[in-house]
Regions:
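S-adenosyl-L-methionine-dependent methyltransferase catalytic core, i.e., the SAM/SAH-binding region
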Residues: 1-300
Length: 300
């Protein structure tokens, strides 16, 4: 990509989705449009793509990048949990291929005003859609120490959640919690010194981002409707980036494949027995790919 953005696990995604002329495809986490562009190129001259993203800024960037494909592209501002509704509204149900990339996009991380990163100080926002819901600052102002500890422990899998929560609440009560930079420093001070070399705020920022955007609930809602989005033989690819996401995806896909022990009929066939990860070359070239895990399935 000319903007320096490299979509994660692109060859693997294209291999599983196998885009073809005349097909209909959905990228439910459009981002900068890297995967979408490759799908459109593979499905030329008349394959159609519906791109969904809850971040309006991402839609602007991707819209400009994909403009050359004209009316083969339909972009919709919505969370991926509304995918079936969106596809129905634009007359694209069922689709031949469906992609979900659950990672935070590089522009979100790189722009301090979005509040996702502690590398450059910015407002405590962290919303995927800046027009919706409470910010991280709002959340931190309303929760008590016990609630905050639970968020950090459950969504960040942080062993020092109690210490961090106490430090954050104390700083809040002193009026010191006013930016991502301040939050990162507060978390670092609460951590044992021997943990400082590992970007100590990473797990806490992940936890707050998940809580602000209701990310795990969004994934559950999406997986409830995925089979209804796909035609028989249609393919699904989901890329997760941390264990909380991947556990949900693995469990729900197994259930859809009739392997949950509930007696429910199978609606999909799992395509990869083991999770697919990036190869050494991609991991060296694209650091974002190092934690990516791809699972694929086919509608029965």
């Amino acid at each position: 990509m000319s903007d320096g953005h490299e979509p994660v696990l692109l060859d693997e995604v294209l291999g599983w989705l196998d885009p073809r002329p005349g097909g209909r495809y959905c990228d439910a986490t459009l981002g900068l449009g890297g995967h979408a562009r490759a799908i459109l190129e593979r499905s030329a001259p008349d394959g159609r793509l519906i791109g969904i993203d809850r971040d309006p800024q991402a839609l602007v960037v991707a819209g400009a990048s994909l403009a050359e494909f004209g009316d083969r592209v339909t972009l919709v501002h919505a969370p991926f949990s509304r995918a079936l509704e969106v596809l129905t509204e634009v007359g694209a149900v069922p689709v031949d291929g469906f992609l979900v990339d659950l990672g935070v996009s590089s522009p979100q991380l790189d722009r301090p005003e979005r509040g996702f990163s502690f590398r450059d100080s910015g407002p405590l926002d962290m919303r995927m859609d800046p027009s919706q819901g409470e910010t991280a600052g709002d959340l931190l102002r309303r929760v008590d120490e016990q609630e905050l500890e639970s968020i950090i422990r459950d969504y960040g899998e942080e062993r020092y959640a109690g210490r961090i929560a106490r430090g954050i609440i104390a700083a809040r009560d002193r009026g010191e919690l006013d930016s991502t930079g301040a939050l990162g420093a507060i978390v670092a001070r609460a951590m044992p010194r021997h943990e400082w070399h590992k970007n100590p705020a990473t797990r806490t920022f992940q936890a707050l981002r998940i809580a602000v955007n209701h990310e795990l609930e969004q994934i559950e809602r999406l997986l409830d409707q995925l089979a209804d989005c796909l035609r028989p033989g249609g393919r699904l690819c989901i890329i997760a980036f941390h264990s909380l996401e991947d556990r949900i995806v693995k469990r729900r896909l197994r259930a859809l494949a009739g392997r949950a022990g509930t007696g429910a009929p199978a609606r999909v066939r799992l395509l990869n027995k083991h999770v697919v990860v990036a190869g050494d070359a991609e991991r060296a070239r694209n650091p974002r790919s190092r934690s990516a895990k791809l699972r694929a399935a086919e509608r029965i």
